[in-house]
Every structure is written in structure tokens, then in C-alpha cells.
Amino acid sequence: MSAGGGGQRDAGTAGGRRSKWDQPGPAPAFLLSGAAPLPGRPFPGGGDGGTAVGVSESSAAPSGALDAAAAVAAKINAMLMAKGKLKPAPNTADKLQALGKGPATNKSKDDLVVAEVEINDVPLTCRNLLTRGQTQDEISRLSGAAVSTRGRFMTAEEKAKVGPGDRPLYLHVQGQTRELVDRAVNRIKEIITNGVVKAATGSSPTFNGATVTVYHQPAPITQMSPAVGQKPPFQSGMHYVQDKLFVGLEHAVPTFNVKEKVEGPGCSYLQHIQIETGAKVFLRGKGSGCIEPASGREAFEPMYIYISHPKPEGLAAAKKLCENLLQTVHAEYSRFVNQITTAVPLAGFAQPAAINSVPSQPSYYPSNGYQSGYPVVPPPQQPVQPPYGVPGIVPPAVPMAPGVLTTLPTGVPPVPTQYPISQVQPPASTGQSPLSAPFLPAAAPVKTTLPAGTQPQVQPHPQGQKRRFTEELPDERESGLLGYQHGPIHMTNLGTGFSSQSEIDGAGSKPASSSGKERERDRQLMPPPAFPVTGMKSESEERNGVGSLPGSHDHQAKKMKTSEKGFGLVAYAGDSSDEEEEHGGHKNASTFSQGWSLGYQYPSSQQRAKQQMPFWMAP
């Protein structure tokens, strides 16, 4: 029976006839129908008998393993589709929905979270970096979400004309959970941010499972700078603000080193500003020593301080410090110029200091005599030689001239008592007694307070001495005096001015000698062009003055006037000696002022009387 049964089975197998052993066939058919739609794993042979027999033999595998395989296959397909490497056909989707396992697959696909990040307007380097497969694989590995490129690059005009099915370039991100998608999107945003700006681009987007556009804001910012990798250093260079402050001492005195004053010792001033503010500060322009790389020489601009800083606030702080530095330098230069201006007159007009020290000089004259003391003084007095420099020195003495004139008339009573004594005594004693004993106490304050005004009042003493000497000695002395140009004469005035003032005060009692003495003083004040002629006239005048009586005063005045014409005095208006005669000499003052007016071409003696002090000496 067994053999017959075996033969029947073989016959049934060959002839397609079925036996009772073929009943389990429908079970494998169910498995086939469920396992066939697995994508990428099709089974050959749809449902013929041979296949059913083979599957019935392998039916030992449990049905749960098939379900697990179907689930794994669905998951793999979902990952491939998320990466864009597998695009499911519509018929496959229909099969998935038609088959028994379709609802489970659809459920897993609905669980994927999708997000979109637009990269159409980011800089070119960012766009190239994000569309590279290597970058997208790195993002997928770090985040667990799939990243793919969608759409195409569009310009602004193309975006305005875009059709409904066309979209600008963007990144498609999808993952199993929202956290994975957020992680991928944040990484994309970080890459874009590093390429565009340092600041944050905005809050992270929220996903509700639908398509979300994450990145729109940086579009206008990115248009400013096309280069992304070089952006941070290039941005810092572009944003450097700079300014310049001109020193303003282009015409400074050469001895004032402007560059050194501004930079400080070892450039310490500018380095301090750099340390305080972080700015770049250095000198440029003429005289700065800064060589321009383009021209190989200093800039043609005046010297200035160049300031540059990345931020306007730092530039303002550095500029303020530089302004303070320049103010200090300008103040120092002003003090320097004031010192120069005060030192230069002292060098050119050293005689005021020497004149102020004259009160000690009379001690030389009494001891050595007039002639011996005379050569000692000329060297310091040589700068006084220009006659036109004297008016510049006279003004300080003029305010004192009224004091001198008032004090001298008050001292007139004691002066006549001493005047005859000086005439009677021998020449050597007269040179000592009037200077040392009687007249120094009265005239000392006048000498100290008059730096230059004493010069006009001093001259007459040589004449007083000459009246006391013999006729020959004054001649030699006068010629010797006039041989020295002008400085020695002024020195003589300084040394013998005390007795001359007393003699001027005694003009009321001795008018004849006074007139000759005044003429002599005027002659020596402004030396005449021809010295020998003047010396002869002065000698004759002196002789007549010594031997004349008070009754011959008018005659002396006339002779003095004619001699004044011969002198040709340079205009020397406002001398203190003239004012002295106007107050001290009664008749002699009027005649002498007329003589001066003839020599000076003065308007009239009345105007001289009105104008006691010249206009440039008015206080």
C-alpha cells in the first residue's frame, strides 16, 4: 500500500493531480501574500503548486519572524526615503496600503518629523558647504536625522516669478523624533552663523510635524559680505575708524622740538594713550620722521597725530587724550616763547641792568678821579650806541621824571650851600667831595629808580669839573670824551649825574653857568655829526659861562641858540632833562626850549610847556 500510495503521489505530482496530502497548501499561500510586498525582496514564482509545496516544507518557521522581517524592511525603506536615496513609487504605496502590513508601515512614516531650512540667500561659501554630501552625512551622524537638498537656487527676480511647484534652495530634514530634527537644524544654523555673523540668528524654530521654514532672517545680512570664511578678520579691518589731530606748531621756533614734546621721552606719551584706549596712535606728516611707504618720504601735510581704533568709542577716548596732550604742548610752547621774548631784550639792551647798578659806580670815580674811572665803564655800555634805541629805554624813566623834578626843587636850599664849596675846592677834592659826601644821599633814590632817564640828566658834571680845572685840561678831556662814540658819554653821564642835577637846581642863582651847562648836556646827549667843531663851541661857551655874571644871561641864551643850530640834534623829544629845565629854570627854561625847538623843529615852546610828558611816555 505504501508503494501504491507513493506511486500515486508521484503521479499526482507529475500530472498535477492533488491528493489529501496537499491540503495544507493554503497556509503557505497566506505567507506568500504577506511577504511578497516587501520592497527589494520579491519572491520569484507567484503562487503555483511547486512553490506552494516548497513553502509547505519550510513552514516550520514561525509566523512571528515574518512579521519582524516586514517591520525591519519598512524601517529601512523609511530611512532610505528620508535620505532621498529611495523614492517610493505610487504603486508601491498602493501595495503597502492594500496589504495587511500596510497600516503598520504608514504609521511609522507618519511618525517622522520634517523640517526645512532655506539656504537660497546665504553666502555662496555657506551654500556650497551645506549642499555637500560630506557635510550632510556629518550632520546626520551627529543628530540622527536625515538631511537632503531640495529645490534650486533662485535670484530675487526668479523668486518673484516662481511657479507654484518650484521652490528656492532649501535643506529637507526629517527624523524619527523632534529632538533629532532640532539637533540637525541647530547644527545647520551654527554652520550658517559661523559663515555670516557672530551674533545669534534668532530663536530655534518649533516644529509641529509639518513643513517648517527655519532660516529666513540672515538673508539681508549676508548680502553685505560675500566672503564667509574670511569674514571675521575682514570685518574687523573694514570697521576700523580713524582720525587725525593736527599739532598746529608748524611755525614753531627751531629750538623747540615739537616732535619730542608730543611723543614724550621715548614715545612714552603716545604709548600711554595706546595702552589706555587700545588705539593705534603715532605721528605723521612733516617733521614727524614717519616715512610713507608709497612715496618713501614724509607726508606733505603738516605734522598730525594719526589715531585708529576698531570702535568709535575707543577712537573718541584716544582723541580726547591726544587733544589734552596737544593743549599741554601748546602751553609749554607759549611759556618757551615768553622766556625767549623776555631774554632777547636783556641781551640787546643790557644797559638797564648796568644803569640800575650805577649807584655803586660813584665809589670808583671819587677814588680814581674822573679820567681814571671813565675807561672802566665803556664795555658794558657799548650796546647803547645806536641813538634810536634810547627812546625805547626812556619810557620807563619818564613816569619818574615828575618825581625827580619835584624832589630836586625841594632840595634846592641845601644845594646852593654845597655848590660854592665845590667851586672853591681843588679839582681832585671836588671830584671826591660832591660825589661821595654831599650829593649821594639826596640823589641816590633817583638813580636807583631811573634805569634810563638818568642818562639825559647826568652829562653836565664834566662841564662843572672843567670850570674848576684850567683852560687846557678841559680841552683834552672833552676831545677824549667825544672820541668815544656814544656809549662812553652815557657812562660819563651815569657816573657824574648827581652834581649835575644839583647844578641844574642852582640855575636860579647862576643862570649864565646854567645855560652853558644845559647846552653842554644836550650836546653830549645826542652827539653831533662833526665832533671837533662841537667841542670848540662848547669850550667857548663854557669859558663865557664861567666868567659871565647874572646880568649876561640873555646873551648866553642867544649864543646857546646859535650853537644848537650848528649841532643838528636828532629829535629826542620828551627827555627828562627838558622837563627838568621847564620846572627848575625860570627864564632859562623858555630860552632853552626855544633852542630845542629850533634844533628839533618842534611846533612851539607853548606846546612844549603843555606837553610835559611825550605821548609815548604817558602812563
Swiss-Prot record:
<feature type="compositionally biased region" description="Gly residues">
    <location>
        <begin position="1"/>
        <end position="15"/>
    </location>
</feature>
<dbReference type="InterPro" id="IPR047889">
    <property type="entry name" value="KHDC4_KH-I_second"/>
</dbReference>
<dbReference type="GO" id="GO:0005737">
    <property type="term" value="C:cytoplasm"/>
</dbReference>
<feature type="domain" description="KH 1">
    <location>
        <begin position="110"/>
        <end position="190"/>
    </location>
</feature>
<feature type="compositionally biased region" description="Polar residues">
    <location>
        <begin position="493"/>
        <end position="503"/>
    </location>
</feature>
<dbReference type="InterPro" id="IPR031121">
    <property type="entry name" value="RIK/BLOM7"/>
</dbReference>
<keyword id="KW-0694">RNA-binding</keyword>
<dbReference type="InterPro" id="IPR056149">
    <property type="entry name" value="PRP5/DDX46/KHDC4_KH"/>
</dbReference>
<dbReference type="InterPro" id="IPR036612">
    <property type="entry name" value="KH_dom_type_1_sf"/>
</dbReference>
<feature type="compositionally biased region" description="Basic and acidic residues">
    <location>
        <begin position="552"/>
        <end position="564"/>
    </location>
</feature>
<feature type="compositionally biased region" description="Gly residues">
    <location>
        <begin position="43"/>
        <end position="52"/>
    </location>
</feature>
<dbReference type="GO" id="GO:0006376">
    <property type="term" value="P:mRNA splice site recognition"/>
</dbReference>
<dbReference type="InterPro" id="IPR047890">
    <property type="entry name" value="KHDC4_KH-I_first"/>
</dbReference>
<feature type="compositionally biased region" description="Low complexity">
    <location>
        <begin position="506"/>
        <end position="515"/>
    </location>
</feature>
<keyword id="KW-0963">Cytoplasm</keyword>
<keyword id="KW-0597">Phosphoprotein</keyword>
<comment type="subunit">
    <text>Interacts with PRPF19.</text>
</comment>
<feature type="domain" description="KH 2">
    <location>
        <begin position="245"/>
        <end position="327"/>
    </location>
</feature>
<feature type="region of interest" description="Required for nuclear retention">
    <location>
        <begin position="485"/>
        <end position="554"/>
    </location>
</feature>
<keyword id="KW-0539">Nucleus</keyword>
<feature type="compositionally biased region" description="Polar residues">
    <location>
        <begin position="588"/>
        <end position="610"/>
    </location>
</feature>
<feature type="region of interest" description="Disordered">
    <location>
        <begin position="488"/>
        <end position="619"/>
    </location>
</feature>
<protein>
    <recommendedName>
        <fullName>KH homology domain-containing protein 4</fullName>
    </recommendedName>
</protein>
<comment type="similarity">
    <text>Belongs to the KHDC4 family.</text>
</comment>
<comment type="function">
    <text>RNA-binding protein involved in pre-mRNA splicing. Interacts with the PRP19C/Prp19 complex/NTC/Nineteen complex which is part of the spliceosome. Involved in regulating splice site selection. Binds preferentially RNA with A/C rich sequences and poly-C stretches.</text>
</comment>
<dbReference type="GO" id="GO:0003723">
    <property type="term" value="F:RNA binding"/>
</dbReference>
<dbReference type="Pfam" id="PF22675">
    <property type="entry name" value="KH-I_KHDC4-BBP"/>
</dbReference>
<keyword id="KW-0508">mRNA splicing</keyword>
<dbReference type="Pfam" id="PF23469">
    <property type="entry name" value="KH_12"/>
</dbReference>
<keyword id="KW-0507">mRNA processing</keyword>
<feature type="region of interest" description="Disordered">
    <location>
        <begin position="1"/>
        <end position="58"/>
    </location>
</feature>
<dbReference type="GO" id="GO:0005634">
    <property type="term" value="C:nucleus"/>
</dbReference>
<dbReference type="InterPro" id="IPR055256">
    <property type="entry name" value="KH_1_KHDC4/BBP-like"/>
</dbReference>
